[in-house]
Amino acid sequence: MKKILIVDDEPNIVMSLEYTFKKNNFEVFIARDGQEAIDFLKSIYPDIIILDVMMPMVDGYATLEHIKKDKNLTHTKVIFLSAKNKESDIQKGLDLGADAYLTKPFSVKKIVEQVMELI
């Protein structure tokens, strides 16, 4: 069973994605902010992470920088999912090492397709 970590501070988005990925036979983990995600990543090694950019405590960009430094996570794919939709925001996410950058509002179908493509 593939593992996915969803990192977002919006409860409705988290619930929707959690339901969708459980239905698609993923083991789902949830973090509400970047610091919680970093703490999770000390003990779980997901196949893929869906990561919001704008969150309290530690933002998505800083969280991704941490992920990229962790040798246990070298094969983990990261998709940014964010309301920050300027070209410069998208480019920053990709430059930091994200495998994809999707913008809100989003299509659940598109996210599932992107995840399946990456794993």
Describe the role of every protein-language-model region:
Residues M55:
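Receiver (REC) domain active-site loop signature in two-component systems and cognate sites
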